[in-house]
C-alpha cells in the first residue's frame, strides 16, 4: 500500500529531510509553512506542506495548479519556487507521504510588519512597497495569471527590502471571453475583507481588476495599519464598501443591475463616495489619496490597471520611492501575521477610526484563510 501511494506522489522529488525545519511561520486551512535550512549549504528556505487529506486519488488538483503557475512565473517581485520535495509513505504516516513546496525564504510578510508598532514606513518607503507590488501584478497579469487572494499576509518582503507576491494557491490562468461566451470562474475567491464588489455580487467573468481592488485595500492599510473594511458576511462587506465608495447603482456602475444578487441583496442606498474624505486623516499625501481612490473604484471596467497605476504621479513626485533595506535592518526578528500577537478587533475606517485587528478568525473569512 505504501509503495502504491508513494508512486502516485513525486517519485523524482528529493526527500524533504535534506532540509532542517527551524520554526513554523504559517498555518491555515490549506496547510502549514515552516522556516527551514538546507543541511549541507545552510540556505534558508520556506517549506509549504501540501495537505493530502481527503485526496483519495493522486495529487490535489489545486496544488498542481499552484505548482504549474509558480513554474511559469519568474520575476523579482514574485516568490520563487525552488523545488518540490516529499516524505515517503510509511506505516508511521498512515501510508501517506507528504509533498512540500520549497521557496526562497523571505524574512517578513506585510501583515506582520504592519502589526508591529515599532515598524515605521516613511512615505518614500510606502511608495517603494506599492511600486514593487504593482510591478508584480503587472507581470502576472501580462502572463495571463490572476492572483485571486491579494492581502497583506500574502505580500512577502526580504531582509534586503524586495517585495514578493506569494501564495498562488487560489491563482488561475485567465482569458478573454470567446464567441460571446462569458467565462465561468468561481467567485468564491479572495479573502472577504479584500474581496471586490463584483465578486460579492456574483460575477464569474472577471479579470485583473479583482487583484487591483486588493492592491487598493493594501495601499490604504499602509497608513491605517489594519484592514480598512472588516465585514462579517458578504452582505456586510458590501455595506462597508458602499459606506466608503458610495452606493452601488447603474449610474456609477453601468449594467450592475444585470447581477441577480443586485436585486436580491439589500444594498445600501443614498451613500456618497467618501474614499478621500475618510482616508485623509491617515493619508496626508494628495497623490496617494488619488491613487487609492482610483484603485477602489466600484466598476471594474473603470478601475485603474497596474500599468497606469505605475505611471501615476504618486510614484513620480517628491519624495521619490526609496529602498527599504535600511529601515528593515533595524528589525532583526522576522515578522509574520501568524507569529504576531492576537489583537482585539477595533472599529474600521468606514466608521472613521483605525483598529489593530489583523486576524479575521471570527468571521466566515476563515474559509478562505491562506498561508504563505
Swiss-Prot record:
Autophosphorylation at Thr-186, Ser-347, Thr-350, Ser-353, Thr-354 and Ser-357 triggers kinase activity by promoting cyclin and substrate binding upon conformational changes. Thr-186 phosphorylation requires the calcium Ca(2+) signaling pathway, including CaMK1D and calmodulin. This inhibition is relieved by Thr-29 dephosphorylation. Phosphorylation at Ser-175 inhibits kinase activity. Can be phosphorylated on either Thr-362 or Thr-363 but not on both simultaneously. PROSITE patterns: PROTEIN_KINASE_ATP, PROTEIN_KINASE_DOM, PROTEIN_KINASE_ST. InterPro entries: CDK, Kinase-like_dom_sf, Prot_kinase_dom, Protein_kinase_ATP_BS, Ser/Thr_kinase_AS. Residues 347-366 have a biased composition (Polar residues). The modification Phosphoserine is found at residues 175, 347, 353, 357. One of its GO terms (biological process) is cellular response to cytokine stimulus. GO terms for cellular component: cyclin/CDK positive transcription elongation factor complex; cytoplasm; nucleus; P-TEFb complex; PML body; transcription elongation factor complex. ATP binds at residues 25-33, 48, 104-106, 167. The active site is at residue 149. Protein kinase involved in the regulation of transcription. Member of the cyclin-dependent kinase pair (CDK9/cyclin-T) complex, also called positive transcription elongation factor b (P-TEFb), which facilitates the transition from abortive to productive elongation by phosphorylating the CTD (C-terminal domain) of the large subunit of RNA polymerase II (RNAP II) POLR2A, SUPT5H and RDBP. This complex is inactive when in the 7SK snRNP complex form. Phosphorylates EP300, MYOD1, RPB1/POLR2A and AR and the negative elongation factors DSIF and NELFE. This is Cyclin-dependent kinase 9.
Amino acid at each position: 500500500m505504501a509503495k502504491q501511494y508513494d508512486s502516485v506522489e513525486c517519485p523524482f522529488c528529493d526527500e524533504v529531510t535534506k532540509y532542517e525545519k527551524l520554526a513554523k511561520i504559517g498555518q491555515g486551512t490549506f496547510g502549514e509553512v515552516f522556516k527551514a535550512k538546507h543541511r549541507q549549504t545552510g540556505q534558508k528556505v520556506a517549506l509549504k506542506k501540501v495537505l493530502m487529506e481527503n485526496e483519495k486519488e493522486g495529487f490535489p488538483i489545486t496544488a498542481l495548479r499552484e505548482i504549474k503557475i509558480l513554474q511559469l512565473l519568474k520575476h523579482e517581485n514574485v516568490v520563487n519556487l525552488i523545488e518540490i520535495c516529499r516524505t515517503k509513505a510509511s506505516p508511521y504516516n498512515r501510508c501517506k507521504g507528504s509533498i512540500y513546496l520549497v521557496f526562497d525564504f523571505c524574512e517578513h510578510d506585510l501583515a506582520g510588519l504592519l502589526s508591529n508598532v515599532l515598524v515605521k514606513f516613511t512615505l518614500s518607503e510606502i511608495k517603494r512597497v506599492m511600486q514593487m507590488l504593482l510591478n508584480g501584478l503587472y507581470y502576472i497579469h501580462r502572463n495571463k495569471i490572476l492572483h485571486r487572494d491579494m492581502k497583506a499576509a500574502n505580500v512577502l518582503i526580504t531582509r534586503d527590502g524586495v517585495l514578493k507576491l506569494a501564495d498562488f494557491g487560489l491563482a488561475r490562468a485567465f482569458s478573454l471571453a470567446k464567441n460571446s461566451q462569458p467565462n465561468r470562474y468561481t467567485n468564491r475567491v479572495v479573502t472577504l475583507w479584500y474581496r471586490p464588489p463584483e465578486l460579492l455580487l456574483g460575477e464569474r467573468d472577471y479579470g485583473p481588476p479583482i487583484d487591483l481592488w486588493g492592491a487598493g485595500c493594501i495601499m490604504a492599510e499602509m497608513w491605517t495599519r489594519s484592514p480598512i473594511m472588516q465585514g462579517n458576511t458578504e452582505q456586510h462587506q458590501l455595506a462597508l464598501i458602499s459606506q466608503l465608495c458610495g452606493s452601488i447603482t447603474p449610474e456609477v456602475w453601468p449594467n450592475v443591475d444585470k447581477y441577480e444578487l443586485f436585486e436580491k441583496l439589500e444594498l445600501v442606498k443614498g451613500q456618497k463616495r467618501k474614499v478621500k474624505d475618510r482616508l485623509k486623516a491617515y493619508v496626508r499625501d494628495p497623490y496617494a489619496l488619488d491613487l487609492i481612490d482610483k484603485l477602489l473604484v466600484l466598476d471594474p471596467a473603470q478601475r485603474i490597471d497596474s500599468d497606469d497605476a505605475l505611471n501615476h504621479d504618486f510614484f513620480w513626485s517628491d519624495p521619490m520611492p526609496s529602498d527599504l533595506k535600511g529601515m528593515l535592518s533595524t528589525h532583526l526578528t522576522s515578522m509574520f501575521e501568524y507569529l504576531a500577537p492576537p489583537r482585539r478587533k477595533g472599529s474600521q475606517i468606514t466608521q472613521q477610526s483605525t483598529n489593530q485587528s489583523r486576524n479575521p478568525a471570527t468571521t466566515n473569512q476563515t474559509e478562505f484563510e491562506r498561508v504563505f
